[in-house]
Every structure is written in C-alpha cells, then in structure tokens.
Amino acid sequence: MGKTFFQRGPEIADFSFEMEGRAVEFLMLREDLLDPIVSGNKFRKIGLFQEQMAAGGFAGIASCGGPFSNHLHALARAGYLFGFSTKGLVPGKHFSFLSPTLQDCQKWGMELEMVSREEFAEIRYAKESPEGLAANMLWKGEGGYSEEMYTPYQLLDFGGLEVDEVHVGVGS
C-alpha cells in the first residue's frame, strides 16, 4: 500500500493581517484541497481506518451506507487512490439501477453487495463484521461509525505551530 492520508497532509494557508496596529496571524488548514471527494472529517476518519487496517494486516475496508452515501463514496475513492480493497453493503436488493454515487464507487473498484433492509438494520452500527464478510476486511459501520470515530479530531496537526484558537467550519 502506498501513502496514507495522514502522510499526505493538508495545506496551511496564511491570511495574516494587521488590525488596530497589532499583527494578527490567521492560518487556515485547507483540508478541502486534499481531494475533491475525500477531505475534512472523511480524510481524518479514513486515515485512521488505514492505520488500523495496516496494523491489523487487513487487505481492505468494508462498510455500509445508502445509495447516496458520502461515506461509501469517500471510502471507494480512498481505496482507489491508495491501493486498498473496499466493499460496500447497500440496502435495496430490489434496485435495478445504481445511483450516480454507487456508479462512482464501482468505477473506483468498490465491490458492492445489495442487502435487504432487514439485514442493513442489523449491520449498520455493528461493531463486529457481518456474517459472510471476508476475514481480511476491516469492518466499519454506516458512515464509518466506530468507538474511535471521534479520535481524528484529537489528531489535528498544525506542523509544530502553536495556536491560540481553533475554529471549525461545518457543512452538515
């Protein structure tokens, strides 16, 4: 496997200015520039999952989400960019077409498996791998849900800079 997201690192933009005779240093961590699909919280979650995958000797990451899941979209893209396998479990055994999101996932090499709504309800927040999932795949619930999903926000690295305040933009 090649580089991970954490090795890649986001750009820091400098918007420093002077106000009332005092220098104000304003730096912006531009995680949105990492990749058009995998950035921000997805960059942090998937970077953490990559480390867990490597430490556990897994070949890839499996997760679940709906037909328009941003999480599956980002996971498939990350697998494509960084050379690891991905699998997505999606509710809707009876769909005869794939959404544009799932078409992208397939284009980036994600193996898609359609499951019933009942199966999806059982696995969406499961901590253990669903029955039948290959043992060499690291399992993460819907949206990347896991106990450690909040850890990435503790991993903010400002390249050795001391910061007084951190402001976070949210696009939910």
Predicted regions, residues:
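PLP-dependent amino-acid enzyme catalytic core
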Residues: 1-172
